[in-house]
């Protein structure tokens, strides 16, 4: 299935039905009074996150999604039927934005998360509601309200813990296929990867993390060159970036240091926040470097690249060094996850609504005071 991570659609909620102005007409009931029912509410449009969907292709060609209108009210106190709601199923990680106002409507981050993106109009009131002591036969009624109508932008950002960065043919797809259950296409030419791939890396029972491989970047990607710039958004939710560098390129004229610096520059141009994410350096294809030259080549690269962060030497093809890297990544993610939970607990403890519980008062109320 083709990978589509962006779409624009129009969602139209149903209009509310009109109220009815009707009088009760029955034999032996000379002054029946009003009996006009209310109109039904219009149907709403909902978005639901579904982990079994991984693309927005259903919305690339289906541009208009409209719920049904509510039925009009009728006499004999008959209320109009409400319009049926419609549900749009989208991948987990979809961001829904109003194109006219720029408002963030929803960020679908959990399976089965449901958000209303267009509300149906309220039904009108029948003349039954306007009866009073001075107006025993009201003729007034109200019309239904129109439903919301929106042009929305759908943007998919995959949910992954770790993202892979690197030039085309750096070995990213080989690495993700070596350490996870992902089976991306692998070949000896650039841009083999045309869409993001996700893989689950398991380091033990109930111990795993998700890794994302995106198409390789080239110089000028932030201005639109190549394929990588349009997929960089998929790395914005990650907690760690692995910068994979080919230390043994087939073309001897290629400088690994220059390529690595180009990746860093493109990252900075695209998004400063993404550039500031924790980043580890992974030197790949060391099986292609003679063993007696390996240490010197790694040292020379680190010196020229001016890198002082974590460094891992691997061979994605043979698996050398991959296991240690995966364990280190898992430990890092677990440590920072615990730190984040601790920070949230501190924020909660500082909340004035919970001070009673901190002081041991079991009867202290939770939540805002009246």
Curated annotation (Swiss-Prot):
<feature type="binding site">
    <location>
        <begin position="315"/>
        <end position="317"/>
    </location>
    <ligand>
        <name>GTP</name>
    </ligand>
</feature>
<feature type="binding site">
    <location>
        <position position="173"/>
    </location>
    <ligand>
        <name>Mg(2+)</name>
    </ligand>
</feature>
<keyword id="KW-0460">Magnesium</keyword>
<dbReference type="GO" id="GO:0005737">
    <property type="term" value="C:cytoplasm"/>
</dbReference>
<dbReference type="InterPro" id="IPR045086">
    <property type="entry name" value="OBG_GTPase"/>
</dbReference>
<feature type="binding site">
    <location>
        <begin position="213"/>
        <end position="216"/>
    </location>
    <ligand>
        <name>GTP</name>
    </ligand>
</feature>
<comment type="subunit">
    <text>Monomer.</text>
</comment>
<keyword id="KW-0378">Hydrolase</keyword>
<dbReference type="Pfam" id="PF01018">
    <property type="entry name" value="GTP1_OBG"/>
</dbReference>
<keyword id="KW-0963">Cytoplasm</keyword>
<dbReference type="InterPro" id="IPR006074">
    <property type="entry name" value="GTP1-OBG_CS"/>
</dbReference>
<comment type="function">
    <text>An essential GTPase which binds GTP, GDP and possibly (p)ppGpp with moderate affinity, with high nucleotide exchange rates and a fairly low GTP hydrolysis rate. Plays a role in control of the cell cycle, stress response, ribosome biogenesis and in those bacteria that undergo differentiation, in morphogenesis control.</text>
</comment>
<feature type="region of interest" description="Disordered">
    <location>
        <begin position="127"/>
        <end position="147"/>
    </location>
</feature>
<dbReference type="GO" id="GO:0003924">
    <property type="term" value="F:GTPase activity"/>
</dbReference>
<dbReference type="GO" id="GO:0042254">
    <property type="term" value="P:ribosome biogenesis"/>
</dbReference>
<feature type="domain" description="Obg">
    <location>
        <begin position="1"/>
        <end position="159"/>
    </location>
</feature>
<dbReference type="InterPro" id="IPR014100">
    <property type="entry name" value="GTP-bd_Obg/CgtA"/>
</dbReference>
<keyword id="KW-0547">Nucleotide-binding</keyword>
<keyword id="KW-0342">GTP-binding</keyword>
<feature type="binding site">
    <location>
        <begin position="191"/>
        <end position="195"/>
    </location>
    <ligand>
        <name>GTP</name>
    </ligand>
</feature>
<feature type="binding site">
    <location>
        <begin position="284"/>
        <end position="287"/>
    </location>
    <ligand>
        <name>GTP</name>
    </ligand>
</feature>
<dbReference type="GO" id="GO:0000287">
    <property type="term" value="F:magnesium ion binding"/>
</dbReference>
<protein>
    <recommendedName>
        <fullName>GTPase Obg</fullName>
        <ecNumber>3.6.5.-</ecNumber>
    </recommendedName>
</protein>
<dbReference type="Pfam" id="PF01926">
    <property type="entry name" value="MMR_HSR1"/>
</dbReference>
<feature type="domain" description="OBG-type G">
    <location>
        <begin position="160"/>
        <end position="334"/>
    </location>
</feature>
<keyword id="KW-0479">Metal-binding</keyword>
<feature type="binding site">
    <location>
        <position position="193"/>
    </location>
    <ligand>
        <name>Mg(2+)</name>
    </ligand>
</feature>
<feature type="binding site">
    <location>
        <begin position="166"/>
        <end position="173"/>
    </location>
    <ligand>
        <name>GTP</name>
    </ligand>
</feature>
<dbReference type="InterPro" id="IPR006169">
    <property type="entry name" value="GTP1_OBG_dom"/>
</dbReference>
<dbReference type="GO" id="GO:0005525">
    <property type="term" value="F:GTP binding"/>
</dbReference>
<dbReference type="InterPro" id="IPR027417">
    <property type="entry name" value="P-loop_NTPase"/>
</dbReference>
<dbReference type="InterPro" id="IPR036726">
    <property type="entry name" value="GTP1_OBG_dom_sf"/>
</dbReference>
<dbReference type="InterPro" id="IPR006073">
    <property type="entry name" value="GTP-bd"/>
</dbReference>
<dbReference type="InterPro" id="IPR031167">
    <property type="entry name" value="G_OBG"/>
</dbReference>
<comment type="similarity">
    <text>Belongs to the TRAFAC class OBG-HflX-like GTPase superfamily. OBG GTPase family.</text>
</comment>
């Amino acid at each position: 299935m083709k990978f589509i991570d962006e779409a624009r659609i129009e969602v139209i909620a149903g209009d509310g039905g009109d109220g009815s102005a009707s009088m009760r007409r029955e034999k032996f009931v000379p002054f029946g009074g009003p009996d006009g029912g209310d109109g039904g509410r219009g149907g709403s449009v909902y978005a639901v996150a579904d982990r079994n969907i991984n693309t927005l292709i259903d919305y690339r060609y289906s541009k208009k999604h409209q719920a049904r209108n509510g039925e009009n009210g009728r006499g004999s106190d008959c209320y109009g039927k409400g319009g049926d709601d419609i549900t749009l199923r989208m991948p987990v990680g979809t961001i829904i934005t109003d194109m006219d106002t720029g408002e963030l409507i929803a960020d679908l981050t959990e399976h089965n998360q449901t958000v209303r993106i267009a509300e149906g109009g309220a039904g009108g009131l029948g003349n039954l509601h306007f009866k009073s002591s001075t107006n025993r036969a009201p003729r007034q009624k109200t019309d239904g309200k129109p439903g919301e109508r929106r042009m929305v932008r759908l943007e998919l950002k995959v949910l992954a813990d770790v993202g892979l960065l690197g030039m085309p043919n750096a070995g990213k797809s080989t690495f993700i296929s070596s350490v996870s259950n992902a089976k991306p296409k692998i070949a000896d030419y650039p841009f083999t990867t045309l869409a993001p791939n996700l893989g689950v890396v398991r380091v033990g029972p109930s111990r795993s993390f998700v890794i994302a491989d995106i198409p390789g970047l080239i110089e000028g990607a932030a201005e639109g060159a190549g394929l990588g710039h349009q997929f960089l958004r998929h790395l914005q939710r990650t907690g760690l970036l692995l910068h994979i560098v080919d230390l043994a390129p087939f073309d001897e004229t290629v400088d690994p240091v220059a390529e690595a610096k180009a990746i860093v520059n493109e990252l900075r141009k695209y998004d400063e926040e993404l550039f500031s994410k924790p980043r580890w350096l992974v030197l790949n294809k060391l099986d292609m470097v003679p063993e007696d030259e390996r240490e010197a080549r790694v040292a020379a690269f680190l010196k020229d690249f001016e890198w002082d962060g974590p460094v891992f030497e691997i061979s994605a093809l043979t698996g050398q060094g991959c296991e240690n890297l995966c364990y280190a990544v898992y430990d890092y993610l677990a440590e920072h996850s615990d730190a984040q939970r601790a920070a949230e607990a501190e924020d909660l403890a500082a909340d004035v609504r919970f001070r009673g519980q901190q002081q041991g008062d079991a009867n202290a109320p939770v939540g805002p005071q009246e």
